[in-house]
Amino acid sequence: MAIRFYRDYTPGARDRLVVSSSEGTVRFKPQKKLISGFTCRKGRNNRGIITSRHRGGGHKRLYRQIDFRRSKRGISGRIVTVEYDPNRNAYICLVHYEDGEKKYILHPGGIKIGDTIISGPMATILIGNALPLTNMPLGTTIHNVEITPGRGGQLARAAGTAAKLIAKEGRLATSRLPSGEVRLISQNCLATVGQVGNVDDNNRTLGKAGSKRWLGKRPKVRGVVMNPVDHPHGGGEGRAPIGRKKPLTPWGHTALGGRSRKNHKYSDTLILRRRRNS
């Protein structure tokens, strides 16, 4: 995919960069049997309380049912389309399997229309194939990695991301995740060979506030311009500093660098190195 530059004929188009499909392979019309309704929760829970701020609005979407489990074991499939998915920054592929079933998977970088993929323990180490970590050599680049066997891929699913298999010992394998975290994973977990496609997505520049609203993201108001009743940073005369030793969240917890992970979690024993930004 290529990066498209906009001329500054309007303020919104100035400095705007989008990922364009110059090859014409990205399709926007989904498979009808693989879509379902999608209700925007606007960051609210079942009681209507805001649990995730700055969410709401955005364009109406249909959810594409992605096969993160790669459930068609031992049956080869052919890549028919590469499609745009409004629910994620990675593209998706429509796969036609030999038994006639159709499924969506994440688009592995380098896979083209007409290529053949397969999943299962006997799959070869080729881009797009899915197999257990125990059957992969060290140094393999992987994505869509399972945490629990059979639950479906949960790690390294964003556009352009990939994990790396760096060690095996006993029943566990060691992998380096895109965040820099080094984690132990069961060797029975499934992963897909290769990197997620659309690697140029991190170079995208939206260009205007309206583009952010199309994605369902609302404006973020700084706490220092609020009233004291609304935020710990609020209040004061004019442009006053926050008046605290360190920045705080609206609920009084440490912000901007403070640890937010709970202590005494089961997965603490599986994490050998924390993320770079934690």
UniProtKB/Swiss-Prot annotation:
It is found in: Plastid, Chloroplast. One of its GO terms (cellular component) is chloroplast. Keywords: Chloroplast, Plastid, Ribonucleoprotein, Ribosomal protein. Gene3D superfamilies: 2.30.30.30, Nucleic acid-binding proteins, Ribosomal protein L2, domain 3. It comes from the Eukaryota. NCBIfam families: rplB_bact (TIGR01171). Part of the 50S ribosomal subunit. This is Large ribosomal subunit protein uL2c. It comes from Huperzia lucidula.
